[in-house]
Amino acid sequence: MVLEEEKDFICRLKNRDNEAYIRLYDLYFSRLYRLAVHLVYGEEEAKDIVQQLFVDLFEKPVRLEGVRHLGAWLCMAVRNRCLNYLYVQDIEDKRKMLYLEAINEADAPEWLADEEL
């Protein structure tokens, strides 16, 4: 898109122009989806991340204030959301591991008693 055309397009998005949102989705979904799949290694997770970005933009178009290059901004937004997703997954994985370790430690004396018999 030419810079002037992109400014007009962003203005239409901020004004919640439905046709502009449809065009935004058509122009960028597949590119953003491929980026997300590459980052999170999961198709469903990637799809959810990208779809949520589009929903958030529709609900709060003010996020587009100051955006000059829409494609670059969208890619950065997807990247940030993917990194956040991976961070949350890492925390959940660590929590699960700690839980399993606690269970194993709680069961350890019973196992030791069985082995001594």
Regions inferred by a protein language model and the residue ranges of each:
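Extreme N-terminal regulatory/targeting segments of RNA polymerase sigma factors
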Residues: 1-8
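Internal acidic/polar
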Residues: 3, 84, 92-117
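Short, charged helix-capping/linker segments at alpha-helix termini
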Residues: 14-23, 33-52, 65
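Hydrophobic/aromatic residues within well-ordered alpha-helical segments
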Residues: 24-28, 32, 78
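Structural recognition of an alpha-helix C-terminal capping motif at a helix-to-coil junction
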Residues: 34, 48-55, 59, 68-80
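A short, glycine- and basic residue-enriched loop/turn
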Residues: 29, 43, 61-67, 71
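Arg/Lys-rich amphipathic alpha helix in sigma70-family domain 2
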Residues: 62-66, 76-97
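Hydrophobic side chains within well-formed alpha-helices
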Residues: 9, 20-21, 49, 70, ...
